[in-house]
Design a protein with these regions (language model features):
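Charge-rich, low-complexity N-terminal segments
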Residues: 1-133
Length: 133
């Protein structure tokens, strides 16, 4: 399996409702380093996994709607607990749609799976990984 990973970052604010979250129940900020890995069994006709420029630009566009936002006020997340894991899936869905829609290039349809990792710090990260349906 071949893979290429691109990286960006976002800064958000949110609160996590529920006793399980302890002090994170209050409004707080987070800076995430966001990695998106693209996997495919065989290279495309240009001998690449994905166009890195398009992948980087698309990730930047996906993250733009979240960057510097208070997720408690974000319409797409009303009623949701915006955990790191939840945000991984949200970004995954947006990136998978970009693959399916051809925004990552004419041969991106050969991408088999994606993994979206949100690095909270040097000691904690979460990810969502799945096949592209």
């Amino acid at each position: 399996m071949y893979a290429v990973e691109v990286r960006d970052h976002i800064m958000i604010a949110h609160s996590l409702k529920g006793a399980v979250f302890g002090p994170a129940q209050g409004l707080h900020g987070a800076t995430y380093v966001v990695d998106v890995a693209f996997f495919r069994a065989e290279l495309d006709p240009d001998n690449i996994v994905v166009d890195i420029g398009r992948a980087t630009d698309t990730l930047k566009q996906v993250l733009h709607a979240l960057n510097y936002a208070n997720l408690d006020d974000h319409l797409a997340f009303m009623g949701q607990v915006t955990t790191t894991e939840f945000l991984c899936r949200h970004i995954f869905d947006q990136m998978a749609a970009a693959v399916r829609d051809g925004r990552l290039g004419p041969h991106a349809g050969g991408i088999d799976r994606l993994r979206v990792t949100l690095n909270e710090s040097h000691i904690a990260k979460a990810w969502y990984e799945a096949a592209i349906a």
